């Protein structure tokens, strides 16, 4: 009883978890000291107990999106087990329930064609359909102002 043992373990965050916590590489949640500088990291949200699943899906999506020069900025799994991802180009992707990796794989296969097919920046993609998906684009103003 005349000794005090203290163990200090450095935590390396890989993502934000919720509003105030971080997730480490082993999918463990920790809260930093208030004075810690907040790094630029992706933001994850999910139900308690799903940290490991969210981190695994994030890593898989990152690998899949790399050839498209995209990355995951945020990944959310809600209480109904519905997935949503926001990409580095500000594109929101509604993945829905089921296997998010399979649905993103379908998106990755046709992404270059979608880019080439339309005018206006893509704002969101809805992958919840079994036989396709919906793309919402930002409206392009085709009316030029005349000066005279």
Regions flagged by a language model, labelled:
Residues 1-148:
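Charged, solvent-exposed interaction patches on well-folded alpha/beta domains
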């Amino acid at each position: 009883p005349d000794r005090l043992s203290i163990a200090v373990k450095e935590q390396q965050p890989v993502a934000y978890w919720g509003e105030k916590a971080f997730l480490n590489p082993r999918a463990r949640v920790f809260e930093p000291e208030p004075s810690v500088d907040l790094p630029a990291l992706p933001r994850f949200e999910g139900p308690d107990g799903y940290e490991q699943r969210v981190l695994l899906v994030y890593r898989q999506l990152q690998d899949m999106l790399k050839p498209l020069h995209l990355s995951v900025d945020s990944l959310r799994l809600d209480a109904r087990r519905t997935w949503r991802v926001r990409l580095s180009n500000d594109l929101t992707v509604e993945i829905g329930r089921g296997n998010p990796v399979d649905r993103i794989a379908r998106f990755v296969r046709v992404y270059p064609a979608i880019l080439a097919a339309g005018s206006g920046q893509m704002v969101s993609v809805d992958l919840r359909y079994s036989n396709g998906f919906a793309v919402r684009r930002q409206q392009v103003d085709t009316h030029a102002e005349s000066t005279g």
